[in-house]
Design a protein with these regions (language model features):
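Short loop segments and helix-boundary regions at transmembrane helix junctions
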Residues: 1-49, 91, 152, 156-168
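Short, Lys/Arg-enriched, Gly/Pro-containing loop segments at transmembrane-helix junctions
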Residues: 46-50, 95-100, 219-227
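Helix-loop-helix "hairpin" substructures at the membrane interface of multi-pass membrane proteins
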Residues: 66-144, 168-169
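Cytosolic-side transmembrane-helix boundaries in multi-pass membrane proteins
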Residues: 103, 110-117, 183-227
């Protein structure tokens, strides 16, 4: 489902050159409302005070690596997919063409690459992986489908990708670093006088410092294309 939804943004990009970030945000914003309605309506658990579905049966939940924490075997799936994406992007013909389309669309088109195809396929793949991430969260972290459980997950993914500079293997330490910031901010708010605003500012400053080089490179490449 995630791949199909993200694929729509790729189709819009191919047909009308729309910004895939904006279209995917608009589509997901509408679908989140529908999913929340289903969770709190037809699938709501009347025995639970939470706005959520019934708990996932134990036999379908992911095994915990540490019983006292929420860390589960989805970590190994994430490592596997990160390595798989790295291999696909750097060791296959399709991956090479996909990277060329991302680096310079006109150069790729001049080289005979079907640029339109590689506007849709990456969106389908990334949407599918994002859908898997949501499934892992339900089966491993929450053990049920909560209203708004995916809030901010997509933006976190963008932040991690910026920190990792779009390197699939670097996504692993980048995600751990980002999770450390998130957990540290929550712990600071719970165990000290640090407010949510202060924690958010500290996170933002660290994030901007880490991603400054990536943003500078993005702006520089756009200037070179304009010239």
């Amino acid at each position: 489902a995630g791949g199909i939804i993200a694929g729509l943004s790729g189709v819009f990009k191919m047909a009308w050159d729309t910004d895939e970030l904006i279209t995917s945000f608009l589509i997901s914003s509408a679908l989140i409302l529908i999913v929340d309605f289903i969770i709190t309506g037809p699938m709501d658990d009347p025995t639970n005070n939470l706005l959520a579905t019934s708990p996932i049966p134990l036999q379908y939940r992911f095994l915990k690596i540490y019983p006292t924490s929420k860390l589960d075997i989805s970590l190994f799936f994430a490592l596997f997919f990160a390595a798989g994406v790295y291999f696909f992007m750097n060791r296959t013909h399709w991956g090479y063409e996909m990277r060329m389309c991302g680096l310079n669309r006109e150069f790729a088109r001049y080289g005979g690459i079907n640029v339109g195809k590689f506007m849709v396929i990456p969106m389908i793949l990334s949407g599918g992986l994002h859908g898997l991430g949501g499934g892992f969260a339900i089966l491993g972290t929450y053990d049920m489908c909560l209203k708004g459980f995916s809030g901010g997950m997509g933006w976190n993914g963008i932040a991690v990708a910026l920190i990792a500079k779009n390197n699939p293997l670097a996504v692993i330490p980048a995600a751990l670093f980002f999770a450390y910031l998130e957990a540290g901010a929550k712990a600071a708010m719970l165990h000290s006088d640090v407010t949510f605003e202060i924690a958010a500012i500290v996170q933002s400053v660290i994030f901007y410092l880490v991603t400054a080089q990536a943003l500078y490179g993005l702006v520089s490449s756009k200037k070179r294309k304009a010239l």
